[in-house]
Amino acid sequence: MEDEYNYIVSGLERSGTSMMMQILYRGGFPVAFDKSRPPNEHNPKGYYELEGGKIINRLMDGTFPMEKYRGKFIKITAYGLKFLPKGKYKIIYMVRNIDEIMDSMEKMSGPIDREVEKPLFEKLNRFAMRLLEKRDDIEYIVVKYNDVIKNPKKEIERVNEFLGGRLDVDSAVQAVDPKLYRNVREK
């Protein structure tokens, strides 16, 4: 039977979307990615993206072939969710402490104006959550990055339940590497 859903991992940049794609891949769920953005010191296990993360432009102009990826997970950042055409979606939305996200971004590209950026990131997260709640063609689960690091098996079991038991949880857990959790902020 052909899968009727388009599956998406989403969230702000640096929120753990690549980690979740790795979890799904290791757990045996079909994922779609290419080699357009190779691993580097910021994501040593890879980005697991299509088209170097440039899907949003194609969603905006209606040229992204969503039907081609039915039944597979793809990664689309939070901003891109507003451009999803009508369909049938299951979305894993990753959240992470905004200060940790900004710490990670600064390590990648240098200083940012936190007083300006933090409210924008918070607003984008709220916007994405409202969109997920509002659209009747989207089923979603929110996964906290820190919870995956602290208790990977429990969180991956929760994701597995959302996906109807299609993951090999023990294999998926192996994708989580707490050593890569480098931008820690105690709450």
Describe the function of each predicted region:
Residues 32-36, 117, 164-175:
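Short, surface-exposed acidic
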Residues 22, 40-41, 114, 133, ...:
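Short linear sequence motifs
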Residues 1-70, 177-187:
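PAPS-dependent sulfotransferase catalytic core
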